[in-house]
């Protein structure tokens, strides 16, 4: 059973599962796990690992429209090197500070492989799920896509300094809070835009039609691959927000969202499926 099948199994047993974070009362809550072999390529600093792992949970909270307030991390490693542990905690603390949240500690454990489990909470005054998109809505994306794909290419090429910089994504907490007031459905693109579109379509019982010419592809990605659009769509690891917004609210959302907000397509009927430039888009993306 792969990760996707496992998630479907759990979703069939837990009725409230299926969104980026659970909302209990007025609190959003999420948990994530990352491993050395699947999430941290050779050359990833412990600072970047701290930033990225805690950032992933902050991003999940943001995807519900909640305001992230705090995060914790459990750090497992074969040994506890002073400099590595300090760098990890500093990265975790810094990403929280960057979005107005607080890093409040965690746990340590001896582990055969460097492994991190993180959790974050937030205030959920207004909840957005994956299941509210309707035909006619605009599909929007924050920021740019492909930073992580570019980082992986740079790690492979030995340019670890630049790769680590690209790997330190900014969780869209501020954007999620204001975009959530306009969106009918929203999630983050941690597993890739293609996968996110398929998940939103399935949850909302609709289709998605996206125009490659409208995609906000990161400049760094065009420098390292001959097909930046394909990588930006299918690679994942970017943690931008993908949302459905009624067309009459797009300009208000764009004016309110910090940073860029790109309209990349529209929500269609379920029978149309998920399409890129009119062609069926494969359900590809990051798999742990």
UniProtKB/Swiss-Prot annotation:
Name listed for the protein in its UniProt record: Thiamine-monophosphate kinase
Binding sites annotated in the UniProt record for Mg(2+) 5: 191
Q: What is its EC number?
A: 2.7.4.16
Q: Where does substrate bind?
A: 39, 286
Q: Which CDD domains match?
A: ThiL (cd02194)
Coiled-coil features, chain-numbered ranges: none
Q: Which reaction does it catalyse?
A: thiamine phosphate + ATP = thiamine diphosphate + ADP
Recorded hits in HAMAP family, A to Z, give: TMP_kinase
Family, according to the entry, reads as follows: Belongs to the thiamine-monophosphate kinase family.
Q: Which Pfam families match?
A: AIRS, AIRS_C
Residues at which Mg(2+) 4 binds: 20, 30, 60
Identify the residues that bind ATP.
106-107, 130, 190
One of the record's GO molecular function terms:
ATP binding
Residues at which Mg(2+) 1 binds: 32, 107
Q: In which pathway does it act?
A: Cofactor biosynthesis; thiamine diphosphate biosynthesis; thiamine diphosphate from thiamine phosphate: step 1/1
Residues that bind Mg(2+) 2: 32, 60
Which positions does UniProt annotate for Mg(2+) 3 binding? 20, 60, 188
User: What keywords sit in the KW lines?
Assistant: ATP-binding, Kinase, Magnesium, Metal-binding, Nucleotide-binding, Thiamine biosynthesis, Transferase
Q: What else is known?
A: Reaction mechanism of ThiL seems to utilize a direct, inline transfer of the gamma-phosphate of ATP to TMP rather than a phosphorylated enzyme intermediate.
Give the protein's function.
Catalyzes the ATP-dependent phosphorylation of thiamine-monophosphate (TMP) to form thiamine-pyrophosphate (TPP), the active form of vitamin B1.
One of its GO biological process terms is:
thiamine biosynthetic process
């Amino acid at each position: 059973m792969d990760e996707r099948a496992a998630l479907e199994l759990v979703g069939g047993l837990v009725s409230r599962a299926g969104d980026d974070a659970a909302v209990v009362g007025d609190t959003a809550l999420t948990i994530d796990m990352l491993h050395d072999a699947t999430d941290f390529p050779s050359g990833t600093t412990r600072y970047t690992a701290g930033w990225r792992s805690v950032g992933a949970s902050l991003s999940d909270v943001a995807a519900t429209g909640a305001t992230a307030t705090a995060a914790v991390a459990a750090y497992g490693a074969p040994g506890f090197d002073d400099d590595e542990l300090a760098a990890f905690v500093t990265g975790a603390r810094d990403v929280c500070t960057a979005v107005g949240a607080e890093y409040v500690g965690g746990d340590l454990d001896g582990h055969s492989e460097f492994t991190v489990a993180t959790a974050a909470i937030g205030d959920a005054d207004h909840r957005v799920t994956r299941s509210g998109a309707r035909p006619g809505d605009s599909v929007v994306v924050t920021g740019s896509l492909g930073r992580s794909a570019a980082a992986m290419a740079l790690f492979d090429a030995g340019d670890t300094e630049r790769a680590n910089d690209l790997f330190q994504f900014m969780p869209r907490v501020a954007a999620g809070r204001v975009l959530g007031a306009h969106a009918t459905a929203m999630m983050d693109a941690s597993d890739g835009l293609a996968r996110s579109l398929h998940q939103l379509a399935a949850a909302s019982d609709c289709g998605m039609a996206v125009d490659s010419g409208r995609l906000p592809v990161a400049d760094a990605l065009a420098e390292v691959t001959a097909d930046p659009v394909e990588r930006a769509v299918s690679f994942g690891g970017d943690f931008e927000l993908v949302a459905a917004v009624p067309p009459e609210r797009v300009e208000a959302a764009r004016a309110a969202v910090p940073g860029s907000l790109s309209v990349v397509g529209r929500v269609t009927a379920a029978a149309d499926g998920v399409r890129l430039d009119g062609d069926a888009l494969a359900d590809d993306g990051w798999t742990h």
